[in-house]
């Protein structure tokens, strides 16, 4: 008994000793490092890149193997191979090589019972070419031949340069299935006129799913009885699929329209999983899909989920990018003289700096880094972006390539003080005193605006000279203006330097022979001002005035009677005599601008009052 107890005790001691040794060894061994998340992501990306590389190399390897096999066969049987590959052609009279050719691409996919059309609904044209000259054959009996339209197997892959014999062409004809109607109905013959023909109405009665390659081609051949004794090579189209008309309701659009439902895009089935996920995220049409893809493509991928593979995503993205965009543009003004321009799907398209427009592809790498920050800022503050029609921004000068975007321009400003816009009294053309029309007392040769420590030339100056100002008055009395974003500062000054030969606005008005009868009544001024306010260009002007909000000091924050306006450029008296007929309209135009300014002041005051009420409500809630 005691012996057993001793044996058990010894065995327990040995086991305990072994466990202690194991623990010491484990403590001495360094712990295995767990892979970091970044390394896991890198490995996953490497695997994905490797898969893409393999998929891209596959067709190249297939082509190389095919070429090597052809070379090996050529060595084994060169005579047989050359006999097989040489095109069996019979040249026309005079050694001409005549070929038929389709000049239009088909709109695919096609559906049974539907008319065969070209891309975007265009007609399908065919021509007879003389390949020795490369021109359409317009004379001779061949140029008036009749042609048969036939259906070919999609496996007829012989390249145009290789040529084919008439027997090969006939061997790939496809006939209707037993017990079915003719596969192709309608105008199955075309008559050439001076070597050119147009296909009539053609309709497929059966789909292409029952043949091995599941695709058809259209072919053209010369009808029997024409061009006897000469070889005219047939024509064929690209392979295409003909689907059952019941699937036309789910047809994809090529190209898709912005207002199309999102399931019109490839890889998104109607009422399918992807369609439901997009609708749940508030994406219902192609425009909304494209906008999110531009602003945050990763978020869009997350919405679609893991069921969307990389290849499916690439196909979907490529199809969506073929969409035709509208002419609407969006501009975000992060600074007074800088505007970031986006197209209709919120994609960055260019930069406005001063009076220049810089397309996105003209920016240098350093400039792109600066612009990327502005684009992100615009996406974060999209409620501040202003919508324009692209035609309204055509007044900016476009720069194709630039090395530097310089926001401060050289200035030369005299020390003479500026004159208030509304302090000038203008006499009528008949030399009698007139009402106090707003005008400018002097004409400046150069105008520059100072804001803080920077100097800016006004963007695309409102009017470069008096002659331009007169030509900008249209026949309807509307004023066409090209203005940049409003700029401002607390210590704003506008300094002018008068030319010696011109004294005042009165002198300019006195040079005109044509006058106005009496004074303009208040009712007439109001009527013409209302007419001007309805003008599209003036509406654009008012939108520009109201875009800065109420937190900055701009020319619009100044008093109505002390508005500093851009001065004219230096011109000679000969310029004024060139167009005297528009002088009266010029004065009326200035009156309209004055009315627009007052209306702009009113709108801004109302906006400021609304903002103050909102702030007060927020403070009360706190």
From Swiss-Prot:
The keyword ATP-binding does not apply. Keywords: Activator, Calmodulin-binding, DNA-binding, Nucleus, Transcription, Transcription regulation. Residues 10-89 are annotated as: Calmodulin-binding. Residues 1-35 are annotated as: Disordered. Expressed in stems, flowers and root. InterPro entries: Calmod_bind_C (IPR046829), Calmod_bind_M (IPR046830), Calmodulin_bind_N (IPR046831), CBP60 (IPR012416). Residues 159-282 are annotated as: DNA-binding. The keyword Glycoprotein does not apply. Residues 1-19 have a biased composition (Basic and acidic residues). One of its GO terms (molecular function) is calmodulin binding. It comes from the Eukaryota. It is found in: Nucleus. GO terms for cellular component: nucleus. Interacts with calmodulin (CaM). Belongs to the plant ACBP60 protein family. Transcription activator that binds DNA in a sequence-specific manner, likely 5'-GAAATTTTGG-3', to promote the expression of target genes. This is Calmodulin-binding protein 60 C.
């Amino acid at each position: 008994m005691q012996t057993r107890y001793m044996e058990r005790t010894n065995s327990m001691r040995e086991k305990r000793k072994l466990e202690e040794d194991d623990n010491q060894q484990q403590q001495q061994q360094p712990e295995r490092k767990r892979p970091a998340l970044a390394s896991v992501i890198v490995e996953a990306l490497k695997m994905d890149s490797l898969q893409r590389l393999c998929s891209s190399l596959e067709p190249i390897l297939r082509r190389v193997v095919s070429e090597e096999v052809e070379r090996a066969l050529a060595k084994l049987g060169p005579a047989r191979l050359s006999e097989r590959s040489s095109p069996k052609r019979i040249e026309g009279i005079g050694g001409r090589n005549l070929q038929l050719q389709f000049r239009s691409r088909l709109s695919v996919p096609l559906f049974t019972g539907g008319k065969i059309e070209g891309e975007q609904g265009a007609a399908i044209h065919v021509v007879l070419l003389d390949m020795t000259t490369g021109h359409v054959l317009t004379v001779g009996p061949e140029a008036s031949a009749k042609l048969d339209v036939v259906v070919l197997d999609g496996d007829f892959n012989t390249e145009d340069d290789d040529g084919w014999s008439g027997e090969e062409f006939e061997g790939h004809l496809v006939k209707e299935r037993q017990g079915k109607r003719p596969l192709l109905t309608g105008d199955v013959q075309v008559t050439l006129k001076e070597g050119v023909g147009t296909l009539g109405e053609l309709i497929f009665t059966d789909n292409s799913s029952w043949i091995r390659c599941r695709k058809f081609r259209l072919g053209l051949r010369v009808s029997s009885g024409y061009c006897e004794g000469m070889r005219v090579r047939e024509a064929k189209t690209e392979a295409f699929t003909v689907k059952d008309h019941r699937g036309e309701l789910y047809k994809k659009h090529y190209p898709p329209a912005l207002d199309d439902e999102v399931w019109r895009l490839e890889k998104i089935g109607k009422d399918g999983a992807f369609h439901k996920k997009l609708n749940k995220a508030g994406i219902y049409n192609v425009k909304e899909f494209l906008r999110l893809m531009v602003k945050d493509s990763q978020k869009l991928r997350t919405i679609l989920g893991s069921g969307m593979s990389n290849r499916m995503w690439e196909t979907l993205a490529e199809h969506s990018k073929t969409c035709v965009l509208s002419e609407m543009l969006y501009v975000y003004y992060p600074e007074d003289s800088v505007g970031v321009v986006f197209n209709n799907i919120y994609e960055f398209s260019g930069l406005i700096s001063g009076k220049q427009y810089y397309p996105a592809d003209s920016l240098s790498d350093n400039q792109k880094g600066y612009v990327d920050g502005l684009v992100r800022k615009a996406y974060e503050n999209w409620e501040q972006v202003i919508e324009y029609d692209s035609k309204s921004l055509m007044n900016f000068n476009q720069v194709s390539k630039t090395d530097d975007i310089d926001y401060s321009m050289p200035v030369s400003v005299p020390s003479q003080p500026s004159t208030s816009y509304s302090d000038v009294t203008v006499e009528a053309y008949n030399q009698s005193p007139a009402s106090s029309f707003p005008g400018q007392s002097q004409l400046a040769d150069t105008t520059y605006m100072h804001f803080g420590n920077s100097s800016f030339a006004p963007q695309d100056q409102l009017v470069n000279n008096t002659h331009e100002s007169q030509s900008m008055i249209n026949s309807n009395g509307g004023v066409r203006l090209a203005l940049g974003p409003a700029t401002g500062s607390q210590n704003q000054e506008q300094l002018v330097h008068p030319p010696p030969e011109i004294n005042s606005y009165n002198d300019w008005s006195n040079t005109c022979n044509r006058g106005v009868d009496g004074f303009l009544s208040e009712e007439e001024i109001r009527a013409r001002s209302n007419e001007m306010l309805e003008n599209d260009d003036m509406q654009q002007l008012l939108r520009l005035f109201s875009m800065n909000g109420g937190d900055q000091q701009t020319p619009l924050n100044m008093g109505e009677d002390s508005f500093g306006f851009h001065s004219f450029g230096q011109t000679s008296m000969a310029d004024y005599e060139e167009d005297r007929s528009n002088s009266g309209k010029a004065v009326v135009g200035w009156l309209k601008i004055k009315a627009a300014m007052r209306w702009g002041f009113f709108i801004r005051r109302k906006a400021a009052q609304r903002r103050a009420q909102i702030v007060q409500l927020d403070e009360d809630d706190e």
